[in-house]
């Protein structure tokens, strides 16, 4: 055999070494910064920005979070007093010079101890008395009257801006990020906008609301204050994690979102907004009250990770950072400054419902950050228009290009053979080779990672809780290795120069289908979460079009056939009439048949093997990529150095450098957009299984994003060297073993178990429960000393399991043992009186309840059957918030529970209730034994939530002390302790 020639080294050619190096370096260069941005926060400025004091802010956060301060705790009152003092100090410091410069910038503080509201939602009724703190910094263009003091008077002007944070925490968390950082940011905003030179044009209302953690009560009751008529836009600062970056969670429209673009470190994606619209995210923030019920237009900025510390004792200043505080504060200042300086009338217009503010309507928004430093925002209808355009123009362009290629006789795709002018022979083109590779390779690789997702969800479903990057590594290494291995096998068996163009064509077809789906959602539901698909489709279209344009560099098929035929004729002459290279009809037919196979054709067909004339020793050398062969030539003849390996001879004229352009059109933008989206979603959901969410969802999401990120390698991966895929195979084996056998929790990534103690005040029965995921909740319950020897009952509770046991640890929620005071008998903890009233309209049953509890300001009435109406004495109602169920009397959709919250400790509530007559709904057949009167049964319950002093709730202290270090205890309900008495009326 003659020596195979090599060509000159070309670092940009479509050969194995350049492809491996370029693709690897680009992916590393893009993914590494994305991971850094996800976990490394911007540094705090060395000197204070004008109008701010960062050290003061950090010290305020430490002061705010020195204890648990839920609404139903004495500590909450202390926090409220501290806030009023801090607000007064800030305003007093800046007041003198501010008033001298601009009298219009006066600041007003409203200590709201008057507002209350009754709301009904589903089977739950809530009466709440607010203790909000509202600070109004009058804008230079605001109404100069004190209009809020005149009943029925509304402000004039363009509307103001609301910034909100809630100062209550849960009963088991210090509230550093939920919502301490938001509260401290609000204090600094007051400082900033009362500093001379920063006076707002529009009025600024800063709301410190109390009672968010249980039913968003503080935001609802804010609607009853006159100042709530002023703002048309809002910024809600929240925490659904315990640190990291503050994420733009959702926004109402493009016009308001553009002000977030001013943030020095923007972070977030409209994908999270779609999660709320589609109902995938079940928790809510005050945003839904301001935007949905009151008609404001605004933004929701929140911490979203780590969820393992959210609502636990690790949500404290020690586990957050000054960098997190600065990240939220800088975004709040920049966004608010833009909103209060806005001179447009974009936020004026018709109210979106009765009683809502006249803020007008905005346009749907698309928004996302780039590396945490830049922010893109544009209108949804722009995305829709571009999507429709690409859906039409893309396929049409490829079709027209294909027609032109066919007319010029350069359409080698799908070509089987072509005849020379002399009719001597049919020259094979092998134009079908590679057509079916993408469906097989893409389907196999995707199936492999999806299969891994199901495997993880089955064997070790919680491993993503602490080891999400081990899961990512497993998915990525598996996907790349399988894709490379299958591509190399296919290329080894049937080498083809059409691999790239066919794979790109399939990719564009897939992207086109995805674009159709996302475009439908954009138009029908206003869902913009598929914004990255248009970039995917556009880049893939351009790369595919380039491959089609490359075909213009090829000779006409007839010219190629004539040249091939001429070469054979000359060789016949030179060989003295030898018939070795003269294809007789039988051979020609066989040759044509052999050159038509697809990827599904048997590799053992006929007498020719799939691995014939394939030389490995040359191609394994980096320079050996230039080795090639001609078709129908003698083995001893020199091969064309411009043909890669054993690909089609006509491919010698294809450009060698265009692959880089194609890769750059697809991979970088997709890696950036999809990569950061994948990391964002992973951080948001990988610790949600403990809350009862799907165990499969995080793994399936990682599998999908792995596929989307690395699919751009498929047109090129068959030219990859074996080194990196082999290394990734080892990574896959190691991470697979780890993910299958590793324990999923640790002291830094604890699983949350939900605590509740229920006391029957009539009988003295005392039951403690932990709710969580099996088998971990069962293991934790078994470790509690007071549960030893007890019959621990574990029953399903929705998506979780409740394990409970009888306990002899009585809560000291009325009188602490260390106080020296006599303990109060249990039956005096809750007092109630139920009085039967005269029948109401339509002969409904009526009763009046009076209920109060010692050392609490939260109680509830639970009914065994639904009531149709209720009214709490002294309560306000609002048409924006339904105060009674909309139902026909006697249906099962009535109210089953009324929660009662008072700003006064030990308050007595008076509640009138109505319920349907059993007679009226059962053909006058009355089975009651009380003389024809329908009875109403249920429980009168009060709640206790203050666990700041050890020994107040001994059962909680015991659970915290004896559960394993990988367990975090949080509250299950509005109260840590529920004391109940039964009633019948």
UniProtKB/Swiss-Prot annotation:
Database matches in InterPro entries: Fxna-like_M28_dom (IPR048024), M28_fam (IPR045175), Peptidase_M28 (IPR007484), PFF1_C (IPR053975), PFF1_TM (IPR053976)
The species this protein was found in: Talaromyces stipitatus (strain ATCC 10500 / CBS 375.48 / QM 6759 / NRRL 1006) (Penicillium stipitatum)
CDD domains: M28_Fxna_like
Name of the protein: Vacuolar membrane protease
GO biological process terms on file: proteolysis
Cytoplasmic-side positions: 1-16, 405-438, 491-500, 547-659, 718-726
Residues annotated as site: Transition state stabilizer: 310
Subcellular location: Vacuole membrane
Active site positions: 212 (proton acceptor)
Classification via SUPFAM superfamilies: Zn-dependent exopeptidases
Required cofactor names: Zn(2+)
Residues given in the record as Zn(2+) 1 binding sites: 166, 178, 238
């Amino acid at each position: 055999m003659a020596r195979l020639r090599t060509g000159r080294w070309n670092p940009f050619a479509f050969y194995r070494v350049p492809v491996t190096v370029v693709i690897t370096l680009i992916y590393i260069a893009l993914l590494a910064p994305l991971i850094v941005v996800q976990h490394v926060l911007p540094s705090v400025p060395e000197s204070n920005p004008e109008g701010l004091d960062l050290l003061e802010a950090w010290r305020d956060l430490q002061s705010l979070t020195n204890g648990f301060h839920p609404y139903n705790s004495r500590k909450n009152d202390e926090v409220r007093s501290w806030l009023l003092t801090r607000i007064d100090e800030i305003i007093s410091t800046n007041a003198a010079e501010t008033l001298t410069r601009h009298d219009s910038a006066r600041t007003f503080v409203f200590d709201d101890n008057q507002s209350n509201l009754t709301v009904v939602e589903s089977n739950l009724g809530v009466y709440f008395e607010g203790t909000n703190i509202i600070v109004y910094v009058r804008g230079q263009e605001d109404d100069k009257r004190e209009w809020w003091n005149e009943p029925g008077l509304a402000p004039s002007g363009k509307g103001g801006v609301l910034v909100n944070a809630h100062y209550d925490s849960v009963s088991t968390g210090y509230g550093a990020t939920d919502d301490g950082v938001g509260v401290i940011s609000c204090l600094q905003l007051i400082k900033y906008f009362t500093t001379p030179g920063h006076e707002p044009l529009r009025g600024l209302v800063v709301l410190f609301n109390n009672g968010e953690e249980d039913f968003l009560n503080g935001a609802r009751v804010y609607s009853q204050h006159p100042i709530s008529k002023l703002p048309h836009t809002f910024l809600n600062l929240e925490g659904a994690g315990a640190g990291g970056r503050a994420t733009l969670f959702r926004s109402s429209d493009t016009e308001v979102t553009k002000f977030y673009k001013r943030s020095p470190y923007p972070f977030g994606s409209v994908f999270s907004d779609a999660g709320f619209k589609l109902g995938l995210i079940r928790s809510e923030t005050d945003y839904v009250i301001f935007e949905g019920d009151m008609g404001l237009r605004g933004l929701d900025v929140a911490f979203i990770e780590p969820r393992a510390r959210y609502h636990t004792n690790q949500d404290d200043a020690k586990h957050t950072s000054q960098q997190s505080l600065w990240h939220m504060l800088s975004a709040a200042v920049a966004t608010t400054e833009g909103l209060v300086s806005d001179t447009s009338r974009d936020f004026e217009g018709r109210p979106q419902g009765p009683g809502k503010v006249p803020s007008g309507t905005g346009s749907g928004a698309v928004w996302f950050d780039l590396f945490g430093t830049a922010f893109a925002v544009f209108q949804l209808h722009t995305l829709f228009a571009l999507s429709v355009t690409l859906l039409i123009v893309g396929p049409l362009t490829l079709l027209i290009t294909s027609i032109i290629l066919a007319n010029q006789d350069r359409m080698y795709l799908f070509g089987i053979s072509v005849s020379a002018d002399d009719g001597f022979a049919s020259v094979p083109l092998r134009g079908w080779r590679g057509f079916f590779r993408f469906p097989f390779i893409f389907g196999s690789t995707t199936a492999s990672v999806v299969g891994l997702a199901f495997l993880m969800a089955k064997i070790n479903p919680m491993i993503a809780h602490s080891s999400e990057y081990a899961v990512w590594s497993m998915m990525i290494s598996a996907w790349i290795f399988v894709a490379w291995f299958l591509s190399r096998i296919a290329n080894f068996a049937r080498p083809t120069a059409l691999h790239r163009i066919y794979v790109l064509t399939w990719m564009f077809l897939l992207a086109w289908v995805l674009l159709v789906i996302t475009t439908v959602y954009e138009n029908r539901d206003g869902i913009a979460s598929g914004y990255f698909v248009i970039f995917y489709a556009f880049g893939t279209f351009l790369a595919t079009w380039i491959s089609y344009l490359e075909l213009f560099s090829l000779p006409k098929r007839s010219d190629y056939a004539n040249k091939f035929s001429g070469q054979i004729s000359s060789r016949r002459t030179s060989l003295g009439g030898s018939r070795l290279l003269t294809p007789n009809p039988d051979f020609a037919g066989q040759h044509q048949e052999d050159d038509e196979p697809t990827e599904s054709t048997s590799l053992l067909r006929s007498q020719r093997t799939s691995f014939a004339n394939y030389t490995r020793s040359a191609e394994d050398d980096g320079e050996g990529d230039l080795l090639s062969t001609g078709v129908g030539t003698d083995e001893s003849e020199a091969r064309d150095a411009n043909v890669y390996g054993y690909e089609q001879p006509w491919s010698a004229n294809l450009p060698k450098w265009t692959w880089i352009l194609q890769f750059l059109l697809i991979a970088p933008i997709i890696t950036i957009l999809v990569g950061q989206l994948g990391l964002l979603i992973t951080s948001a959901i990988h610790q949600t299984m403990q809350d009862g969410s799907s165990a499969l969802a995080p793994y399936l999401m990682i599998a999908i994003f792995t596929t989307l990120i690395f699919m751009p390698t498929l047109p090129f991966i068959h030219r990859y060297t074996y080194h990196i895929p082999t290394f990734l195979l080892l990574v896959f084996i190691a991470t697979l073993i780890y993910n299958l056998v590793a324990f999923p929790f640790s002291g830094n990534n604890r699983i949350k178990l939900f605590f509740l103690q229920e006391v029957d005040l009539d009988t003295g029965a005392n039951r403690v429960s932990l709710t969580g995921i099996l088998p971990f909740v069962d293991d934790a319950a078994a470790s509690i000393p007071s549960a030893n020897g007890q019959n621990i009952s574990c029953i399903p509770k929705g998506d979780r399991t409740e394990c409970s046991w009888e306990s002899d640890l009585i809560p000291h929620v009325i009188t602490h043992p260390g106080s020296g005071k006599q303990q109060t008998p249990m039956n005096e903890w809750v007092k109630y009186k139920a009085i039967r009233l005269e029948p109401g309209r339509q002969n409904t049953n009526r009763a009046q309840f009076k209920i109060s509890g010692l050392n609490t300001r939260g109680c509830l009435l639970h009914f065994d059957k639904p009531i149709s109406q209720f009214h709490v004495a002294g309560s306000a109602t609002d048409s924006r918030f339904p105060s009674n169920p909309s139902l026909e009397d006697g249906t099962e959709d009535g109210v089953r529970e009324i929660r009662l919250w008072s700003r006064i400790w030990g308050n007595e509530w008076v509640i009138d209730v109505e319920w349907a007559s059993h007679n009226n709904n059962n053909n006058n057949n009355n089975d009651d034994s009380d003389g024809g009167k329908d009875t109403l049964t249920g429980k009168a319950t009060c709640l206790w939530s203050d666990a700041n002093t050890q020994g107040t709730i001994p059962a909680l202290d015991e659970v915290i002390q004896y559960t394993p270090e990988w367990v975090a205890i949080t509250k299950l309900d509005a109260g840590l302790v529920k004391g109940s008495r039964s009633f019948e009326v």
